[in-house]
A protein has these predicted regions:
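Boundary regions of SH3-family modules and the immediately adjacent low-complexity/disordered segments
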Residues: 5-7, 11-17, 21-29, 35-77, ...
Length: 115
């Protein structure tokens, strides 16, 4: 992440993990101004961004269900900070996979650009 939209600006932050979700705040040519989960903001070149939809679980022990209803079978509880890959979302639910598990989770326990 850089302080401005060009390679001439100083590096502000280096990400060491792939697929972290970010929210895009602005654009300037091939650069996007982003905000990450820790509220860091800065500029990143579009070639470094993935098209994969991801989010971070923000509630400890969030339940992953087999179907998009609380009456469905619980599969696993996810810890805070868990990276999840979003397959699709409905009004209140998202179908995700993470750590070999796949199921439905409430949308309001996820951080990232869900829709």
């Amino acid at each position: 992440m850089r302080q401005g939209p060009s390679f001439e600006y100083p590096i502000k932050l280096i990400y060491k993990k792939k697929y972290l979700p970010v929210i895009i705040l602005d654009k300037s040519g091939p650069w996007k101004k982003i905000k990450d989960f820790d509220n860091n903001t800065g500029w990143i070149h579009t070639v470094l961004l993935s098209k994969k939809k991801t989010a971070i679980n923000i509630k400890n022990n969030s339940v992953l269900y087999k179907k998009s209803t609380i009456f469905s079978k619980p599969i696993v509880k996810l810890e805070t900070g868990r990276l999840v890959f979003i397959k699709k979302c409905k009004v209140e639910w998202c179908k995700i996979n993470s750590g070999g598990y796949e199921g439905w989770i409430f949308k309001n326990v996820l951080w990232g650009k869900i829709n």
